[in-house]
Swiss-Prot record:
Catalytic activity from the UniProt record: GTP = 3',5'-cyclic GMP + diphosphate
Name of the protein: Receptor-type guanylate cyclase daf-11
EC class: lyase
Residues bound to Mg(2+) 1: D770, D814
Keywords attached to this entry: Cell membrane, Cell projection, cGMP biosynthesis, Chemotaxis, Coiled coil, Glycoprotein, GTP-binding, Lyase, Magnesium, Membrane, Metal-binding, Neurogenesis, Nucleotide-binding, Olfaction, Pheromone response, Sensory transduction, Signal, Transcription, Transcription regulation, Transmembrane, Transmembrane helix
Organism of this sequence: Caenorhabditis elegans
Disruption phenotype: RNAi-mediated knockdown in AWB and AWC sensory neurons results in a defective preference between different food odors.
Length: 1077
């Protein structure tokens, strides 16, 4: 029974075949046929292919296409889809033509898939899909079919799911719209272990995964099959076939625990799959319609065959695998169809021509003719809903509030103004409500005719006409300028431009050109000149709009024919200050014929110059002529021509004119501005001459904008240059900080995006140091005092390390770790660098006074070890360069097991020093028991020979944060530096030690005391015997180091013996390790 590991399948199959033993495969299907093997897997490639063949035959399909995603089954070790070549072979043997096979990736999007599957258009309409074990895996493909308009009337996708998951999961449960994508898709699903059949088995056992459940079910059936076969063979010996048991088993009818088991003559299990179809019209049963189960029959040459018959109760009708007229229409004769289409097109064309003719006739009868070109049929106007025209700028969260405010403004605006199209041209329509049919006299008709037909100028906006709808609304229509009005660009913050101060001359010049043309035309004067009616076209040319309209509106409002939709005044209050008070007085009394007679062409032109004065004031000073005035809706049908209260406010101006500070204005311009509001007003010619002289600008507005953009570009280049320099400076600071945190080579690799892999360094030395008594010192000091102390000490340590070629790995409180030999590889000098660092650090502490405790100095322990380590960068957001290995652990142990003011090292480091750098003086500490490592031999680093000592410049007491300089030449003696200054306490201690060591009697006495102590402590006897032997065999060095130590009380000998304070450190009882002079 087995195997239980897929990698052992062939090995077990060959072994059982050689042994002629029966093997029952329960793990996964394979495309191989092995004697003496019974394959219990329902997911084998052979069973999958036989199910598909029976389905295709049942629907009478002989040619298909396939889409395969091999990556989709990479994580599924039991998948049979990876043996697709076996499925192709079985198709070929059963005369199923596989026309095209498209292979796609696991994360292919629908756009790419839609391009790839176009290969099926000339060859296949039934497409087998092998894209995964879940229906969710097929959503992108179904979307691609929808994108290509592959309808359910043309193509049939067949989703193949060979994995038995005990229950299908439908992706449209949460979103019904997905069911439309899968509509009419056929699902071939392995449901051999239906939950209703295996419920008792599952209730008896529990499994962690579906795969484990399926394998257990197949194992259970395998044991049942074997038992049934053996039981039957005992009672019927003719069935027992020792050489080919699969032949005997295939001939049997085997009632399994979950249903009958069918084995074919090749020993492979044959089991039928379920066939389903997705139907979006079904509101129940998850949009699924069962089409039947592929049944198994033993009445065939292979002893087990599959057969599919569509359920008799199903209404599903499968499509053909080949279109009725072929893939290219080659089967059907298209001549008749072409003739029929041509006839239909001809009839439609005649109908369109007749309809167009009738429409033109109707339009002519409605007044859109040469005589009344200003009358626009309402059906020719296509209105646009401003409140629903949203662009991409409305989609961001930040603009949501602004979008809502804009909607409210547009909804209010839409009550009186509408954007529309007439003859495919965008227009703006002012809306009014009619109480009665409008009455036109000859003057009105002539005015409208002139406005429509004769007023054509570069600085005039085109008047389109007037239209009336069936709901008694009148619309006055003008061409739409989408850059808005000058009022928008001057007083609306969102549309102001910093360069607007340079454009006022061009704006005023365009206004005067248009106004001059109107004054010379048949309509004589504008009558409605405001900033709101000074429009800007796409070329930034000012076009005057609204001319002549006020004459009609005042007449119609006075006679009670019109009012506004929002019941506000016909003449908006925000525009009242543009009109001459004399003109407004006449409008209010327009019903009086004598008052109307006062509006002469000459009077109208003077009123236009008044309006121009207001515009000049607002353009030059960028300031409202009057405070903002607002209209309030009145009662229904009670709107007025002019709001008297607002008009009283507007009429208090314009005099006196006040020029704000900071704005320079030419005297001629001021004089003309004052004259515009006086009794003797300038004419157009004089106004143009003054504007052209005072605000002279060459070229058009576009030319000026190009110049401004050029100047802005040059300034922008300089700004970019300056910002780039600042950025580079900041990057340099960042790089310097990064170089402090990581080695230079590692930092450069990380900056360039190069992965820094861990690396093994065969030759490296690691040094650890730790302040003795730091915890008690912290408890007796303020936090800032501790920080100042550590900062001063580590600044000195860092400078020593940088000068000696080491690298500081980390600093944790008072603990300090230094490495040499990484990341810069050193063959042998790494141990020399560490020795120099340790000695210089020790000497530095002898002169480093605790800032907040004058006269008190720090004591440290040092320990180092040499050997192979591996190092690399840890972390991404806060990367740290760290090293690891047994050598690092042992170096840490050397520090923790050391003695204050002493430098301890391992045998490996001592041997490197002895072989390559004999100038360093070492002494044998002896064997030490190190926790977690065992007993090892350690040494003290005492110093350097007198002829090779390193000269160190004294640390200045008043420079707490910096070490001034350390001499790099090893040949200069430390004695040369100390000769220029009084002897310090360490020098006195050295002399004392030498004197004591010369005393032979004291040395013999100490040795005798040591022997007595060793007799009481067995382990210490062995250690000291080694020390005595080494002292006798190695001889005595010629020089004595500054940090040599003498013992004073041998009876206090311990792992960390007590001693007496000398200088700034502690001298311990280790006299036996110090040779005589």
């Amino acid at each position: 029974m087995g195997p239980t590991c897929s990698s052992n399948f062939l090995r077990f199959a060959n072994l059982t075949a050689e042994m002629q033993s029966l093997e029952i495969n329960i793990l996964k299907g394979y495309p191989y046929e092995h004697p003496t093997m019974i394959d219990m897997v329902t997911r084998s490639p052979q069973n999958l292919a036989q199910n598909l063949v029976s389905l295709l035959r049942g629907f009478e399909w002989g040619q298909v296409g396939a889409v395969l995603c091999e990556e989709c089954y990479e994580g599924d070790e039991l998948a049979s889809e990876i043996y697709f070549s076996t499925i192709e072979d079985i198709f070929e043997n059963n005369n199923i033509a596989l026309k095209e096979t498209v292979r796609i990736g696991k994360r292919e999007n629908s756009v790419n898939i839609s391009d790839a599957i176009t290969i099926f258009e000339p060859s296949a309409r039934v497409i087998l899909l092998f894209l995964g074990n879940k229906l969710n895996d097929y959503t992108e493909f179904m979307t691609a079919m929808s994108m290509n308009n592959y309808t359910t009337e043309e193509y049939t996708p067949v989703i193949v799911i060979s994995k038995n998951s005990l229950e299908l999961t439908f992706p449209w449960k949460e979103n019904d719209a997905i069911a439309e994508l899968f509509d009419k898709a056929i699902i071939v699903y392995n449901n051999c272990y239906d939950k209703s059949k295996i419920s008792s088995f599952l209730s008896s056992y529990s499994f962690s995964t579906i795969e484990e459940t399926i394998i257990s079910l197949q194992m259970y059936e395998g044991y049942h099959l074997l038992g049934y076969y053996l039981y039957t063979a005992i009672t019927n010996t003719t069935l027992f076939n020792y050489v080919q048991p699969e032949k005997a088993i295939s001939s049997m009818s085997i009632p399994g625990p979950f249903g009958e088991i069918f084995i074919n003559s090749n020993g492979q299990r044959i089991a039928g799959y379920d066939v389903l179809v997705v139907d979006k019209s079904l509101n129940s049963n998850n949009f699924i319609m069962p089409l039947g189960t592929i049944s198994t029959d033993k009445k065939c040459p292979d002893q087990a065959c599959l057969n599919f018959v569509l359920n008799s109760t199903s209404s599903f009708e499968p499509l053909k695998d080949v279109p009725l007229c072929g893939f290219h229409g080659e089967i059907c004769d298209q001549t008749g169809v072409i003739i029929a289409i041509a006839v239909i097109m001809g009839v439609l064309l005649m109908f369109i021509i007749i309809l167009t003719t009738i429409r033109k006739c109707c339009n002519g009868s409605k007044g859109r003719s040469i005589s009344n070109p200003w009358v626009i049929p309402f059906q020719d106007v296509r209105f646009i809903d401003l409140t629903n025209t949203e662009g991409s700028q409305h989609m961001s969260i930040q603009s949501l509030q602004r979008n809502m405010e804009e909607k409210q403004r547009l909804q209010s605006l839409a009550r009186t103004k509408h954007i529309a199209t007439v003859d495919q041209v965008y227009v703006l329509a002012d809306k009014y409500v009619m109480r009665d049919k409008l009455r036109y006299d000859k003057i009105d008709i002539n005015l409208l005719y002139q406005m429509k037909s004769h007023l054509q100028h570069d600085n005039l906006n085109s008047f389109v006409g007037i239209t009336i709808d069936k709901a008694s609304h009148m619309y006055i229509i003008w061409n739409q300028c989408f850059r808005g009005s000058l009022h928008d660009h001057i007083f609306t913050k969102e549309r102001q431009r910093g360069t607007a101060t340079r454009f006022e001359g061009l704006f005023l010049r365009d206004i005067l050109k248009g106004l001059e043309y109107i004054h010379a035309s048949a309509i004589d004067f504008h009558g409605n000149l405001t900033l709101h009616n000074c429009m800007l076209d796409s070329h930034w040319i000012v076009k005057l709009s609204g001319f002549g309209v006020n004459r009609l509106l005042v007449k119609w409002k006075t006679s009670g024919q019109i009012f506004t939709e929002d019941h506000t005044p016909v003449i908006k209050s925000e525009e009242l200050h543009y009109f001459d008070p004399a003109m407004k007085k006449i409008w209010k009394n327009y019903a009086d014929r004598n008052e109307r007679a006062l509006i002469t062409p000459q009077f109208g032109k003077k009123c236009d110059m008044y309006s121009f004065g207001v515009i000049l004031h607002e353009i030059i000073l960028k300031k409202k002529f009057v405070e903002q005035l607002f209209d309030s809706p009145r009662e229904e049908d009670d709107s007025v021509l002019i709001d008297d209260e607002n008009d009283a406010i507007a009429s208090r101006f314009p005099l006196p004119i006040i020029i704000p500070e900071g704005i320079e204005m030419h005297n001629d311009l001021i004089k003309m501005l004052e004259n515009c509001f006086g009794s003797v007003r300038p004419d157009i010619a004089l106004a143009r001459k003054i504007i052209d002289t005072v605000l002279k600008m060459s070229g058009s507005l576009v030319d000026l904008m190009i110049k401004n953009l050029t100047a802005y570009t040059q300034g922008l280049n300089e700004t970019v240059k300056n910002r780039t320099a600042e950025l580079e400076k900041e990057q340099e600071k960042g790089d310097q900080l990064l170089m402090e945190l990581l080695p230079k080579s590692v930092a450069n690799d990380l900056k360039n995006g190069i992965a820094v892999d861990p690396k093994v360094y065969e030759n490296a030395t690691i040094l650890y140091s730790d302040i003795v008594g730091f915890t008690s010192l912290c408890s007796q000091s303020q936090p800032m005092e501790v920080v100042t102390l550590l900062s001063g000490m580590y600044q000195r340590f860092d400078l020593i390390i940088s000068q000696q070629g080491g690298y500081k790995m980390e600093t944790i409180g008072d603990a300090y770790c230094v490495a040499a030999g990484l990341p810069v590889v050193m063959e042998k000098d790494h141990v020399k660098s560490i020795c120099m660092i340790a000695l210089l650090q020790r000497d530095c502490l002898h002169h480093f006074e605790i800032p907040h405790r004058p006269g008190t100095f720090l004591n440290c322990r040092w320990g180092f070890n040499s050997g192979p380590v591996f190092a690399g960068v840890i972390g991404q957001k806060a990367p740290r360069y760290a090293c690891f290995g047994e050598a690092v652990i042992l170096a840490s142990k050397m520090e923790s097991s050391g003695v204050e003011d002493r430098i301890q090292m391992t045998l490996a480091s001592q041997q490197l020093l002895e072989e390559n750098f004999p100038q360093f003086v070492c002494s044998n500490r002896g064997g030490r028991t190190i926790e977690g490592i065992g007993r090892i031999l350690t040494y003290w680093l005492e110093g350097v020979n007198a002829g090779e000592q390193v000269k160190v410049v004294e640390f200045q007491n008043d420079l707490n944060d910096e070490l001034s300089r350390i001499m790099k030449k090893d040949g200069e003696l430390l004695a040369a530096a100390t000769a220029l200054k009084p002897k310090d306490k360490m020098t006195l201690a050295k002399e004392k030690v030498i004197a004591e060591r010369k005393n032979e009697e004291e040395r013999l006495q100490r040795q005798q005391t040591l022997q007595e102590a060793l007799e009481e402590h067995e382990e210490e006897i062995e250690m000291n015997e080694v020390l005595v032997d080494e002292d006798e065999g190695e001889g005595k060095p010629k020089e004595v180091d500054l940090t040599s130590i003498v013992s004073t009380q041998m009876e206090e000998l311990e792992d960390e013996p007590a001693g007496r304070t000398i200088g700034h450190g502690r001298l311990d009882s280790q006299a036996s390790t110090i040779p005589d002079n």
